Amino acid sequence: MIRVTFYNHFQDKYDLLGYIVRREILEPVRILLRNSMYREALILIFSNLRKDSAFYQRAYKIEGQNSFEEITENCIYELLLELFSERRSGKPHSKFPWLTVETMARYYARSMNYVVMEWIRSGMTVAPDEVADIYEYIMSHSLWDTLDEL
């Protein structure tokens, strides 16, 4: 792709990286999430990352402003915000108004992104279905449950 054509589509290389994450990793799971197929969505995310592991392990090394970690967290946040907004339809949480869709989307985006980054950092040696099991465990157990199990 020549430079002029590139800049007709993307602002910079970081914009391109966000596009790749959205298109290759998150778009394929959108339909699964909308149909409450959460485990299948997790396995697909980790499988697609692993399929292009060399690319994502290099991208992981991008640090500082516009780091890969920041880009992926924002992409996950955008997807979750959309999904939460569809279900909540603008209504505040009945018991905790502070829990806005934005707050919940950011919390879960950071959580998911942490697991993704640790998995990439560790060389993606754990199988996608096992990483999905780990994430499901973390999400279904409170901090207090986990402390009691130690």
Regions found by a protein language model. Give the residues of each.
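Alpha-helical bundle regulatory/interaction domains
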Residues: M1-L150
